[in-house]
Amino acid sequence: MNAPAVPPAPAAARRSKAPLGVKITGTGSCLPATPLTNAHLEKVMETSDEWIVQRTGIHSRYRIDPARGESTHTLAAEALRRALAAAGLSATDLDLIIVATMTPEMSCPATACRVAADVGASRAGAFDLNAACSGFVFGLNTAHDLIKGGAYRRIAVVGADCLSTLMDYSTAGRGTAIIFGDAAGAAIVEACDDPGKGILAQSMHCDGDGWKEIYVPECERDFPEGVACDPSKYGHVQMNGAAVFKFAVGTFSDLIQETLDAAGVTATDLDMLVCHQSNMRILQSARERFGLPEEKLYVNIDRVGNTVGASVPLCLDELRRAGRIAPGQKVMFVAFGGGLTWGSSLWQL
């Protein structure tokens, strides 16, 4: 019997000198190969392109194909490879990998550990974070503060979700199946010597009593009090659409204002608002409340749907590749989701 391979020695535990600033040095993203259009959904459930677009603004989303080897961890790994390339780094340069996901393929190990193996990050620590759609923003705040405190110098934050694995693609499940898509996005966060770079204000919130508005039951005890157990719903996202919409509309704008106030800036100081892509009406409502021009609120929900924890980093990567964000700008990231959770991160890039 062969002895197990001895892994490379990890980076020595230490408390390094705290940096003056923190910066995002690279981004990457990955979509599955197969788009899932409204026209396709019309063939498998009672719905229409017009009905979907009017209510969500979504024309298409992407769905993994396991036969192609696509999964949460493979999308996450590819997004991270692209982020490392953009930052001019190798995987062995990483100190830590944080993967925000609510669709791990296994209970153990963490998706982050499989991502570390796939990319060759032999010296990095790794763990998962589950805050649903808020996950990447929570991870970004966590990475920033770990670096700011001097514990680490270079962290990868990945948001990856494949909600297609939790969907019921029949008329019974159309309330959620029309909304969600699969994707992954990643950002490299590093220490720097510029004190002007990093988070100006951040927040992370939870209303645990709202858990029953978005949940995935696995057995009888997982259903909220007063809701009859239905085994056909096991493993499928259950969402109270009206309650979630009301929560999002009320919370979204308040969260943005709270973050602006904490940083001592106004909406006109923002160069870009990068929001979780949940619903076109919610996005436009927030933009109008703060008087932002269309070019300062990025939108891709029409092309990719609601990609949950991948939503914000996917937007960030598309903006970077299009040259629409640059060092020195103020960019706010905002997200909300199951839990109920919501959070923000206002950066001086």
Q: Locations of the language-model features?
A:
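Anion-binding (especially nucleotide phosphate/pyrophosphate-binding) glycine-rich loop
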Residues: 86-122
